[in-house]
Amino acid sequence: MAKLSTDELLDAFKELTLIELSEFVKKFEETFDVTAAAPVAVAAAGGAAGAPAEAAEEQSEFDVILESAGDKKIGVIKEVRALTSLGLKEAKDLVDGAPKPVLEKVAKDAAEKAKAQLEGAGATVTLK
């Protein structure tokens, strides 16, 4: 097999959808027995253990959790697609599988904006 340069790999990744890229990352993690999120989790855990007083400060990253779609499921699916760039099937599966996170680790203002949009479409949403 020919060896690919870093630029060639990046060009190939640019052509993938987010779902395809996510599947690639999962396979990569399984094949090489690694976790893409490990360095971030270790750094966050070390920071939290070193300064427990800072934990009382306001949280800076939020997860937007869709609790239920309510009566207007189609409108909620449209909003989920707009917020996440998911395809129709993926957005429908996310809405049908509620409660599920729509957005993870986003800034407070982005989380509140997403919550307002989803609630405007008829969904029940919580921020964590």
Curated annotation (Swiss-Prot):
**Per the UniProt entry, what are the Gene Ontology biological process annotations, in alphabetical order?**
translation
What keywords is this UniProt entry annotated with? Ribonucleoprotein, Ribosomal protein
SUPFAM superfamilies cross-referenced by the UniProt entry:
ClpS-like, Ribosomal protein L7/12, oligomerisation (N-terminal) domain
The GO molecular function terms of this record are: mRNA binding; structural constituent of ribosome
> What CDD domains does the record point to?
Ribosomal_L7_L12 (cd00387)
Origin superkingdom: Bacteria
Is the Ribosomal protein keyword given for this protein? yes
Q: Name one Pfam family in it.
A: Ribosomal_L12
Q: Record's Gene Ontology CC terms?
A: cytosolic large ribosomal subunit
Q: What family does this belong to? A: Belongs to the bacterial ribosomal protein bL12 family.
Subunit and partners: Homodimer. Part of the ribosomal stalk of the 50S ribosomal subunit. Forms a multimeric L10(L12)X complex, where L10 forms an elongated spine to which 2 to 4 L12 dimers bind in a sequential fashion. Binds GTP-bound translation factors.
Task: Summarize the protein's role.
Answer: Forms part of the ribosomal stalk which helps the ribosome interact with GTP-bound translation factors. Is thus essential for accurate translation.
The name on file for this protein is: Large ribosomal subunit protein bL12
Q: Which organism is it from?
A: Kineococcus radiotolerans (strain ATCC BAA-149 / DSM 14245 / SRS30216)
Q: Which gene encodes it?
A: rplL
